[in-house]
Amino acid sequence: MRRFPWAFGIGLVVALAGCGKQDGASSGGSREVVVYTALDRSFSEPILDEFTRQTGIAVRAQYDTESTKSVGLANRIRAERERPRCDVHWNNEIINTLQLKAEGLYDVCDPPEAKNYPDAWRDPDGMWYGFAARARVIIVNTDLVPDEAFPTSIHDLADPRWKGRTGIAKPLFGTTVSHVACLFASLGDDAAMAYLDSLKANDVQVHGGNKGCATSVANGATAFALTDTDDAIIELESGKPVRIVYPDAAEDGIGTLFLPNTLAIVKNAPHRKEAELLVNYLLSAEVEAKLAACPSAQIPLNRSAEPNPRVKGPSQVKAMQADFAAAAEAFPRAREVVEARFLK
């Protein structure tokens, strides 16, 4: 496998800034890197601005929109495959990342910071790296659900006691469809389809997104719902009557699903050296700490980073042993089943 050399440390970049034109530099001598990021602009932009302050490398960022979730930027990378404009793809989930890898749209990279990540969050072929995760959790309204009736599993959304009073995000985009694909890979098609059928039979409320799930529970319109930690923590920390449950974390459970942000360098990236430096910077414990401290409370995966005290990570709660590659393969089947059950 071909590996690429890396410059160790941001300081080296600054030291070399005046040493003549670098690869990817414009005729004026400035250096830049193009990143497509699906993480909310309010969270990702300050991180990218800090990279520029430390290195002098200008970051040209293309941000995703809420309406297209992470799919819009993935499709843009596909459309530009003959003449790539993007250097670094910063995705906020993993299934589209694996699909782009399978389509040959990423290149191998070997950032020094990757050694601080467990194997579960690194592509064995060196084409993507996971960091700054979210957990798939159940947000519960404590005014509506007594302690003794608290859900402990994603299967509790299909409990007849709560018919019509539980919720999920529309399972066609983002982390929700990624979760469904992981269930197909982990449980098998039949069991995953049976689970989706049980949700539909229980009149689960389908919201436009995970934020809608969280606000519905916080406002008392729904008793409990499946969502992401970043949306749940906002309601919890704003003082709403809610608690966060990490589902299926008992010894005999399948575990709570953690879904990372991912980083990859696009094949034939125009600014390869700058892309390598940006990826290594984003994987640093410093960046994970900043993302953990922001309102979305991202979960650090770098072993050198301190755990986020606001939410639990995979070292603190039983984590689902998700086979993301198998989930990506199952995705087309999962989406077909979802469309048949929730769009008709």
Annotate each predicted stretch with a short phrase.
Residues 19-98:
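Early extracytoplasmic/lumenal segment of secretory-pathway proteins
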Residues 36-39, 63, 124-128, 140-143, ...:
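Short beta-strand->loop
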Residues 84-89, 107-138, 155, 165-168:
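A structural signal for short loop-to-beta-strand junctions that line the ligand-binding cleft
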Residues 100-108, 119-126, 235-248:
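Ligand-binding "clamshell"
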Residues 133-134, 195-200, 206-207, 240-272:
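Periplasmic-binding protein-like
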Residues 137-144, 181, 185, 258-271, ...:
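A bilobed periplasmic-binding-protein/Venus flytrap-type ligand-binding module shared by bacterial periplasmic
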Residues 171, 175-178, 182-247:
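Ligand-binding pocket segment of bilobal, Venus flytrap-like solute-binding proteins
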Residues 261-322:
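Mature extracytoplasmic/periplasmic domains
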